[in-house]
A protein has these predicted regions:
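Glycan-recognition and catalytic cores of secretory/periplasmic carbohydrate-active enzymes
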Residues: 1-387
Length: 387
């Protein structure tokens, strides 16, 4: 495998294909912020603004400005999105709405804590790019709200009946693992950060990870006991593999080889569990008992699942030299470039059916924005350059 040639392929796809698409097609220069709902050619098909995706796009361009090149157009793109978030995206208490209209009127209440996590990452990254104390303060206030809400993330918008079947989700500790490293540079109290990381790692490895299955469960009872219901049996292989490369980064930060080795061991188990042996690609959802799924999209092949898994595998290989990781990376690389890449228009498809045929031609929507494709290309490019 020619790592240098591959690195150039990922770099070129990011800088020459994907980023120009979002810069040109997504910016709303009239009202601020970004259009997320972009058809195959980049034409806008819906003007609502989803705060997860607004925050992610600010983060993306600020991160690239900080890490790749001091390009003014990247910084300008991030700043105009952040100004929209600052003015329109939260309730004054730094709880961020799920969605707003094109001109910034709230549509969906701030029930979803992930709007906060991506806003926090955005303002923290932009504070680093600009030196702005205001952006730093917004990031810190938002981070505090995430910690305040962590045990009851939906608060008054929680629809499950209290006490009958208490359950907690894997997504939050997984995102906080990543966010911890994102906000490290703006936190005064590093011990609080270490405590937060300890809690998240412990929760993932001791509560959500079940060695008898070799995977993380997506929802468990508060003490980690599996629950035999639709939600309790659910596995999201892409989530697991994304979390595992976040945790490898924490292993690097802590110089913890045992943690990195454990992550690689679990990752190889998860990808084997999640891989479609008949058609190739990774299933979106699976049931731990192989029972029928409640989610009709369970067998679809999604862009982010494969990109995050590819990052996990090439990072596992980089850190441990495990040849199985490299074999899986090759498999994922071939699958992604032959199925998700659009040969005619920029950016990548997001949604394929089980057989790997394009299900939706959109390049951005309610859940797909300027995030997993560019972040994945960037991460893989950077890792390949070290090999």
């Amino acid at each position: 495998m020619d790592f240098k040639k591959l690195a150039a392929q990922y770099k070129s796809e990011l800088l020459d294909n994907v980023l120009p698409f979002w810069l040109e097609k997504s910016q709303d220069l009239e009202y601020g912020g970004y259009f997320s709902c972009l058809d195959r050619d980049g034409s806008v098909f819906d003007t609502d603004k989803f705060i997860w995706l607004q925050g992610r796009e600010v983060w993306m361009f600020a991160m690239l400005y900080n890490k790749v090149e001091k390009k003014q157009e990247w910084l300008d793109c991030a700043i105009q999105g952040a100004e929209f978030l600052k003015k329109h995206a939260h309730d004054g208490n730094y709880d961020f709405y799920f969605s707003v209209t094109r001109d910034g009127k709230p549509i969906i209440q701030p029930y979803n804590i992930f709007s906060n996590t991506f806003a926090c990452m955005a303002f923290a990254q932009l504070a680093e790019a600009t030196g702005s104390e205001e952006y730093k303060e917004i990031a810190l206030k938002t981070f505090q709200r995430i910690l305040d809400r962590r045990d009851d993330p939906k608060g008054r918008w929680e629809k499950s009946y209290p006490g009958t079947r208490p359950m907690k989700g894997f997504a939050l500790p997984m995102i906080i693992c990543n966010m911890a490293l994102e906000v490290e540079h703006i936190l005064e109290d590093k011990s609080m950060l270490d405590h937060t990381i300890d809690e998240c790692l412990s929760e993932i490895l001791n509560v959500f990870y079940h060695p008898e299955y070799g995977v993380m469960l997506e929802n468990v009872s508060p003490d980690g006991t599996p629950i035999d219901c639709f939600e309790g049996r659910e596995i999201n292989p892409g989530h697991d593999l994304e979390a595992l490369w976040f945790m490898m980064n924490l292993g690097i930060r802590r110089n913890d080889k045992a943690l990195i080795d454990k992550c690689v061991e679990i990752a190889l188990s998860v990808i084997d569990f999640g891989w479609d042996k008949e058609y190739g690609g990774i299933f979106y959802f699976q049931d731990i008992k192989k029972a029928p799924m409640q989610k009709l999209e369970w067998d679809q092949k999604l862009w982010w699942v494969h990109l995050e898994s590819a990052i996990c595998m090439i990072k596992g290989y980089q850190l441990t030299g495990n040849e199985q990781c490299l074999e899986w990376f090759k498999k994922l690389h071939d699958y992604m470039w032959t199925h998700f890449k659009d040969e005619e228009y920029p950016e990548w498809y997001g949604y394929l059916n089980r057989r790997g045929e394009v299900l939706l031609t959109l390049k951005g929507g309610k859940w797909k924005g300027c995030f997993h494709v560019p972040r994945g290309l960037y991460q893989i490019w950077q890792i390949l350059e070290t090999l």
